[in-house]
């Protein structure tokens, strides 16, 4: 009878741990999607380097661009 309780406890805690990691992994994926939606191009602080004044913030790249169109294309 005591052996049965230990097995039940082991199964319970294993499932609890599995649920925790599944929820944690799902939360990270959702954060990545939300981060992509928050991307934007902004004018950087003067002076501009090589006439590139637009910066991508929160997107795929952190480079500088000379036009807003270039920045938007690379950032999103």
From Swiss-Prot:
Belongs to the MEG family. Keywords: Disulfide bond, Signal. The lineage of its organism: Eukaryota, Viridiplantae, Streptophyta, Embryophyta, Tracheophyta. This is Protein MATERNALLY EXPRESSED GENE 4. The keyword Signal applies. The keyword Zinc-finger does not apply. Disulfide bonds join 53-75. Pfam families: Meg. Expressed exclusively in endosperm. It comes from the Eukaryota. InterPro entries: Meg. The gene is MEG4. Residues 1-27 form the signal peptide.
């Amino acid at each position: 009878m005591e052996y049965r309780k230990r097995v039940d406890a082991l199964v319970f805690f294993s499932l609890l741990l599995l649920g925790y990691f599944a929820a944690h992994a799902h939360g990270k994926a959702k954060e990545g999607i939300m981060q992509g939606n928050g991307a934007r191009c902004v004018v950087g602080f003067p002076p501009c380097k090589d006439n590139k004044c637009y910066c991508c913030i929160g997107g795929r790249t952190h480079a500088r661009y000379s036009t807003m169109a270039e920045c938007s294309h690379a950032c999103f």
